[in-house]
Regions:
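Short glycine-rich phosphate-binding loop at a beta-alpha junction
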Residues: 19-27, 140-157
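Conserved, well-folded catalytic cores of nucleic-acid-processing
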Residues: 9-17, 91-94, 139-143, 172-175, ...
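Phosphate/ATP-binding catalytic cores across multiple sugar-kinase/actin-like superfamilies
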Residues: 87, 91-94, 124-150, 194
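Residue-level signature of catalytic and energy-coupling elements of molecular machines
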Residues: 6, 88, 136, 155, ...
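Conserved phosphate-binding/catalytic loops in two-lobed NTP-binding clefts
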Residues: 148, 166-192
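Phosphate-binding glycine-rich/basic clefts of nucleotide- and phosphate-handling proteins
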Residues: 1-105
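Adenine-nucleotide phosphate-binding core of ATP-dependent small-molecule kinases
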Residues: 73-81, 110-139
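Glycine-rich phosphate-binding loops at beta-strand->alpha-helix junctions
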Residues: 76, 80-81, 148-169
Length: 195
């Protein structure tokens, strides 16, 4: 979910989102529908033979052969979307240190080196972190518990490293109650125990 937001706000402008093309006497922005599809890497393999992909050839010519439009064509035609998302994921991991990072991706004619700050990330995912906080408070209310009644909270998975997520948990439960361990493997281990 967070990776999809990073893709939309930080990466798709390198792939032509926002580029305009000439239509008679008007400049029109390329429709964003293809870029919305890119937010879901697991479905992007279907784009290669799609009408959306073919439309990018037209937009490429109408935009004066804009190289950003060519980037999205290269990305889709060579099934590079998953690799791009790995770069996005790495930038998210880097941000968990609280330091600035870059989203780096190099394939053929695509050269993306997009600066990315923790503050930008917090803004991009704010609507999701607001929902996370709302759900936590709702669960506590439904269970008729106060945060003070909880002895410890065990967090795991990649999102548990995201600073805005941790800040919510610290604010609700207190930093001293938050426990973690084997962040990337404990979810899979727990699932394996259920079989």
């Amino acid at each position: 979910l967070f990776d999809s937001e990073i893709m939309w706000y930080k990466v798709t402008p390198h792939l032509g989102r926002g580029v305009k093309y000439q239509s008679y006497d008007k400049e029109i922005e390329i429709p964003s529908i293809l870029y919305r599809e890119l937010k879901n890497w697991e479905r992007t393999f279907m784009l290669k033979e799609s009408k959306l992909r073919r439309s990018m050839d037209n937009y490429y010519h109408l935009s004066g052969n804009n190289p950003k439009i060519d980037n999205v064509r290269v990305l889709i035609d060579n099934n590079y979307v998953f690799s791009l998302f790995k770069g996005i994921e790495q930038s998210k991991i880097n941000l968990s240190t609280g330091e600035d990072t870059t989203i780096d991706f190099e394939k053929e004619t695509i050269h993306i080196h997009e600066p990315f700050t923790p503050g930008e990330f917090a803004t991009i995912i704010e609507r999701h972190t607001t929902e996370i906080e709302r759900y936590i408070l709702k669960i506590l209310d439904t269970a008729q518990y106060n945060a003070a009644d909880i002895d410890s909270v065990f967090i795991t998975g990649g999102s548990s490293l995201v600073i805005p997520v941790r800040e919510i948990l610290y604010r609700i439960f207190g930093k001293d109650k938050i426990r973690t361990g084997n962040t990337f493997n404990s979810v899979a281990y727990g699932l394996s125990l259920s079989y």
